[in-house]
């Protein structure tokens, strides 16, 4: 299982742990990933995704999974999230 957020694309970063004596040792900064189930209002389905805590707050702020995916850039989304986005767009196009 990769350590990349499916909605925001956040991935591990590298850097230094710096001690009080200014000694530096390499470390990894891992994203805070959580397994969550999000519900699409348009599709009436639930989807299990592995997303970061920051992405979960953004989904809530934008008003749900459908609104988040409508604004999200395709480059940041995983293949699974991109498929959900295309399916939502298709249903909205037929409904309009």
UniProtKB/Swiss-Prot annotation:
Query: MF terms per GO, please?
Result: structural constituent of ribosome
Region (Disordered) residue ranges read 1-23
Q: Which GO terms describe its biological process?
A: translation
Q: Which GO terms describe its cellular component?
A: cytosolic large ribosomal subunit
Per the record's keyword annotation, is Ribonucleoprotein included, yes or no? yes
What are the alphabetically sorted keywords of the record? Ribonucleoprotein, Ribosomal protein
Q: Where are the membrane-spanning stretches?
A: none
Ribonucleoprotein keyword on record = yes
Family under the similarity heading: Belongs to the bacterial ribosomal protein bL28 family.
Protein name according to UniProt: Large ribosomal subunit protein bL28
Q: What is the lineage of its organism?
A: Bacteria, Pseudomonadati, Pseudomonadota, Alphaproteobacteria, Rhodobacterales
């Amino acid at each position: 299982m990769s350590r990349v957020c499916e909605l925001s694309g956040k991935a591990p970063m590298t850097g230094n742990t710096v001690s009080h004596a200014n000694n530096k040792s390499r470390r990894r900064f891992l994203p805070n990933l959580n397994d969550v189930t999000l519900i699409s209002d348009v599709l009436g389905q639930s989807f299990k995704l592995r997303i970061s805590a920051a992405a979960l707050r953004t989904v809530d702020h934008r008003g749900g999974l459908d609104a988040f995916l409508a604004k999200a850039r395709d480059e940041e989304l995983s293949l699974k999230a991109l498929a959900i986005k295309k399916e939502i767009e298709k249903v909205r196009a037929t409904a309009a």
